[in-house]
Curated annotation (Swiss-Prot):
InterPro entries per the UniProt record, alphabetical: PYM1, WIBG_mago-bd, WIBG_N_sf
Organism of derivation: Schizosaccharomyces pombe (strain 972 / ATCC 24843)
Biological process according to GO: exon-exon junction complex disassembly; nuclear-transcribed mRNA catabolic process, nonsense-mediated decay
Protein name: Uncharacterized protein C19C7.01
Lineage: Eukaryota, Fungi, Dikarya, Ascomycota, Taphrinomycotina
GO molecular function list: RNA binding
Domain of life: Eukaryota
Polar residues: bias regions: 66-75
One Gene Ontology term, aspect cellular component: exon-exon junction complex
Disordered: region residues: 21-53, 65-196
Biased composition (Basic and acidic residues): 21-35, 84-94, 100-143, 173-196
Protein backbone atom coordinates (compact mmCIF):
# COMPACT_ATOMS: atom_id res chain seq x y z
CA UNK A 1 0.00 0.00 0.00
CA UNK A 2 1.68 3.18 -1.19
CA UNK A 3 0.26 6.73 -1.27
CA UNK A 4 1.87 10.09 -1.86
CA UNK A 5 2.24 12.24 1.23
CA UNK A 6 1.86 15.99 1.33
CA UNK A 7 5.21 16.64 3.04
CA UNK A 8 8.73 16.41 1.53
CA UNK A 9 7.78 13.66 -0.91
CA UNK A 10 7.00 11.20 1.92
CA UNK A 11 5.02 8.07 1.07
CA UNK A 12 2.99 5.78 3.28
CA UNK A 13 4.51 2.28 3.00
CA UNK A 14 3.20 -0.50 5.24
CA UNK A 15 1.82 1.99 7.76
CA UNK A 16 5.05 4.06 7.97
CA UNK A 17 5.84 7.37 6.33
CA UNK A 18 9.06 7.03 4.31
CA UNK A 19 10.97 9.58 2.24
CA UNK A 20 12.50 7.63 -0.67
CA UNK A 21 16.11 8.01 -1.76
CA UNK A 22 16.43 11.11 -3.96
CA UNK A 23 18.79 13.81 -5.15
CA UNK A 24 18.81 17.25 -3.60
CA UNK A 25 19.13 20.50 -5.56
CA UNK A 26 22.81 20.77 -4.67
CA UNK A 27 23.49 17.29 -6.14
CA UNK A 28 23.92 15.34 -2.90
CA UNK A 29 21.95 12.13 -2.31
CA UNK A 30 19.27 11.90 0.36
CA UNK A 31 18.96 8.41 1.88
CA UNK A 32 15.65 6.70 2.34
CA UNK A 33 14.37 7.31 5.85
CA UNK A 34 11.29 6.88 7.98
CA UNK A 35 9.67 10.08 9.27
CA UNK A 36 6.71 11.15 11.38
CA UNK A 37 3.61 12.69 9.78
CA UNK A 38 4.03 16.42 9.17
CA UNK A 39 7.84 16.20 8.76
CA UNK A 40 9.39 18.76 6.40
CA UNK A 41 12.94 18.24 5.17
CA UNK A 42 15.31 21.17 5.80
CA UNK A 43 15.92 21.46 2.05
CA UNK A 44 12.21 22.01 1.42
CA UNK A 45 11.84 24.85 3.93
CA UNK A 46 11.87 28.24 2.20
CA UNK A 47 14.83 30.31 3.26
CA UNK A 48 14.56 33.85 4.57
CA UNK A 49 15.12 36.39 1.84
CA UNK A 50 15.98 39.90 2.99
CA UNK A 51 13.78 42.73 1.70
CA UNK A 52 16.38 44.39 -0.53
CA UNK A 53 18.30 41.39 -1.82
CA UNK A 54 17.23 38.64 -4.13
CA UNK A 55 19.50 35.93 -2.62
CA UNK A 56 18.81 33.82 0.42
CA UNK A 57 21.17 34.40 3.35
CA UNK A 58 22.92 31.05 2.80
CA UNK A 59 23.54 31.86 -0.85
CA UNK A 60 25.00 35.24 0.17
CA UNK A 61 27.37 33.53 2.57
CA UNK A 62 28.51 31.15 -0.17
CA UNK A 63 29.20 34.10 -2.48
CA UNK A 64 31.24 35.79 0.26
CA UNK A 65 33.29 32.63 0.72
CA UNK A 66 33.96 32.43 -3.00
CA UNK A 67 35.04 36.07 -3.05
CA UNK A 68 37.38 35.55 -0.10
CA UNK A 69 38.90 32.49 -1.82
CA UNK A 70 39.43 34.50 -4.99
CA UNK A 71 41.05 37.32 -2.98
CA UNK A 72 43.50 34.89 -1.38
CA UNK A 73 45.16 34.25 -4.77
CA UNK A 74 48.26 36.29 -5.56
CA UNK A 75 47.56 40.00 -5.96
CA UNK A 76 50.46 40.56 -8.35
CA UNK A 77 48.29 39.18 -11.16
CA UNK A 78 45.65 41.85 -10.57
CA UNK A 79 48.16 44.70 -10.20
CA UNK A 80 48.31 47.09 -13.19
CA UNK A 81 51.67 47.42 -14.96
CA UNK A 82 54.13 50.05 -13.68
CA UNK A 83 53.84 53.39 -15.46
CA UNK A 84 56.82 55.16 -17.03
CA UNK A 85 56.97 57.78 -14.24
CA UNK A 86 57.21 55.07 -11.59
CA UNK A 87 59.99 53.35 -13.55
CA UNK A 88 61.93 56.63 -13.68
CA UNK A 89 61.57 57.09 -9.92
CA UNK A 90 62.95 53.62 -9.31
CA UNK A 91 65.91 54.18 -11.63
CA UNK A 92 66.90 57.62 -10.22
CA UNK A 93 70.29 57.67 -8.49
CA UNK A 94 70.42 58.26 -4.73
CA UNK A 95 71.25 61.73 -3.47
CA UNK A 96 74.72 62.37 -2.01
CA UNK A 97 73.49 62.40 1.58
CA UNK A 98 71.73 59.06 1.20
CA UNK A 99 74.84 57.56 -0.42
CA UNK A 100 77.02 58.79 2.46
CA UNK A 101 74.64 57.32 5.05
CA UNK A 102 74.59 53.96 3.30
CA UNK A 103 78.40 53.91 3.01
CA UNK A 104 78.79 54.87 6.68
CA UNK A 105 76.46 52.02 7.74
CA UNK A 106 78.40 49.53 5.65
CA UNK A 107 81.73 50.66 7.16
CA UNK A 108 80.42 50.47 10.72
CA UNK A 109 79.22 46.94 10.09
CA UNK A 110 82.66 45.98 8.74
CA UNK A 111 84.30 47.33 11.91
CA UNK A 112 81.92 45.44 14.19
CA UNK A 113 82.78 42.07 12.70
CA UNK A 114 86.18 40.40 12.31
CA UNK A 115 87.26 38.82 9.07
CA UNK A 116 86.16 35.44 10.45
CA UNK A 117 82.61 36.71 10.97
CA UNK A 118 82.61 36.87 14.77
CA UNK A 119 81.42 40.06 16.34
CA UNK A 120 84.07 42.21 18.00
CA UNK A 121 83.58 43.21 21.62
CA UNK A 122 83.73 46.97 21.99
CA UNK A 123 85.04 48.71 25.12
CA UNK A 124 81.56 49.97 25.99
CA UNK A 125 80.10 46.47 25.99
CA UNK A 126 82.92 45.20 28.25
CA UNK A 127 82.19 47.96 30.78
CA UNK A 128 78.55 46.97 30.71
CA UNK A 129 79.45 43.32 31.38
CA UNK A 130 81.62 44.31 34.36
CA UNK A 131 78.70 46.18 35.90
CA UNK A 132 76.32 43.26 35.52
CA UNK A 133 78.74 40.75 37.02
CA UNK A 134 79.49 43.01 39.98
CA UNK A 135 75.77 43.39 40.70
CA UNK A 136 75.33 39.60 40.55
CA UNK A 137 78.23 39.09 42.98
CA UNK A 138 76.81 41.62 45.43
CA UNK A 139 73.45 39.78 45.43
CA UNK A 140 75.07 36.50 46.47
CA UNK A 141 75.42 37.72 50.08
CA UNK A 142 71.81 38.89 50.20
CA UNK A 143 69.64 37.09 52.76
CA UNK A 144 65.98 36.69 52.09
CA UNK A 145 63.58 37.79 54.80
CA UNK A 146 61.53 34.75 55.55
CA UNK A 147 58.48 35.09 57.82
CA UNK A 148 60.47 33.49 60.64
CA UNK A 149 63.04 36.33 60.65
CA UNK A 150 60.39 39.00 60.18
CA UNK A 151 58.35 37.95 63.21
CA UNK A 152 58.82 39.85 66.48
CA UNK A 153 61.25 38.41 69.02
CA UNK A 154 58.60 37.31 71.53
CA UNK A 155 57.02 35.22 68.79
CA UNK A 156 60.29 33.70 67.59
CA UNK A 157 60.96 32.45 71.12
CA UNK A 158 57.53 30.82 71.45
CA UNK A 159 57.45 27.05 71.59
CA UNK A 160 55.55 25.22 68.88
CA UNK A 161 52.48 23.23 69.86
CA UNK A 162 53.55 19.85 71.12
CA UNK A 163 51.66 16.67 70.39
CA UNK A 164 51.61 15.12 73.85
CA UNK A 165 49.12 13.24 75.95
CA UNK A 166 48.25 16.42 77.90
CA UNK A 167 44.70 17.57 77.24
CA UNK A 168 44.50 20.72 75.19
CA UNK A 169 42.62 23.88 76.16
CA UNK A 170 39.97 23.14 73.56
CA UNK A 171 39.17 19.67 74.93
CA UNK A 172 38.93 21.07 78.51
CA UNK A 173 36.37 23.65 77.42
CA UNK A 174 34.41 20.98 75.59
CA UNK A 175 34.21 18.82 78.70
CA UNK A 176 33.02 21.83 80.77
CA UNK A 177 30.33 22.55 78.19
CA UNK A 178 29.09 19.00 78.20
CA UNK A 179 28.44 19.25 81.94
CA UNK A 180 26.40 22.44 81.61
CA UNK A 181 22.78 22.15 80.52
CA UNK A 182 21.39 25.32 78.90
CA UNK A 183 22.83 27.39 76.03
CA UNK A 184 22.44 31.10 76.79
CA UNK A 185 25.65 33.12 76.39
CA UNK A 186 28.51 33.34 73.89
CA UNK A 187 32.13 33.17 75.05
CA UNK A 188 33.84 36.37 73.80
CA UNK A 189 37.27 34.75 73.32
CA UNK A 190 36.29 31.63 71.40
CA UNK A 191 32.95 32.63 69.92
CA UNK A 192 31.34 29.38 71.09
CA UNK A 193 28.05 29.36 72.90
CA UNK A 194 28.49 28.38 76.52
CA UNK A 195 26.08 26.35 78.59
CA UNK A 196 25.14 27.61 82.03
Amino acid sequence: METNGSFSGARLVDGKWIIPESRRKDGSVRRERAVKPGYTAPEDIKRYRPGRGNFASLEKQMKKLQLSNDASTSKSIDRPPISELEKEKLERPLSNKKKEKNDHKAESLKHDYDSVGEKRISKDSVKHLDKTYSSIDSKKDFKYNFPKTQAPEWRRGAKPLSKTSEPSVYSEKMSKRENKKSINTVDKKTGYKEKE
